[in-house]
Amino acid sequence: MRVEVGQIVNTHGIKGEIKVKSNSDFTDVRFQPGQVLTVVHNNNDLEYTVKSHRVHKGLHMLTFEGINNINDIEHLKGSSIYQERDHEDIVLEENEFYYSDIIGCTVFDDQETPIGRVINIFETGANDVWVIKGSKEYLIPYIADVVKEVDVENKKIIITPMEGLLD
């Protein structure tokens, strides 16, 4: 299964480095040198092997094998990046999920009232924050006091909102 792991937002410098906004988990594995990524540009799948990876100002800075010039990569700005989800070396702990499994889930409160769908996930250091789009946009911390049940198979999440969380 192929999952979207990011988007090329810009280039950096003149040697073919790109800035990638990640919408994925496990970026330390996904973007490590030697990993193969698929860039979808104009409905064409272009495969690239990661040559280098670093994080700068919240963005992932990547170079690809065989790309040494800004002119070779600049046309890919705005393109989405995908990777096959076949990392047997990533072991999920209890209550740990792939972002791609959470994004798109419908969120309900503990009374089964629908709140919205998960549209994005942010890493904050202490815990992830899920962006829920419903009648408004809500930021829900992924903590045990709030998130009570995650049913990935049925794309359903139950939360107990803290006071003021849905205001």
UniProtKB/Swiss-Prot annotation:
UniProt-recorded Gene Ontology molecular function terms: ribosome binding
GO biological process, one term: rRNA processing
Keyword Protease tagged: no
Family, per entry: Belongs to the RimM family.
Entry's free-text remark on domains: The PRC barrel domain binds ribosomal protein uS19.
Oligomer and partners: Binds ribosomal protein uS19.
Protein name in UniProt: Ribosome maturation factor RimM
Organism: Staphylococcus aureus (strain JH9)
Source organism phylogeny: Bacteria, Bacillati, Bacillota, Bacilli, Bacillales
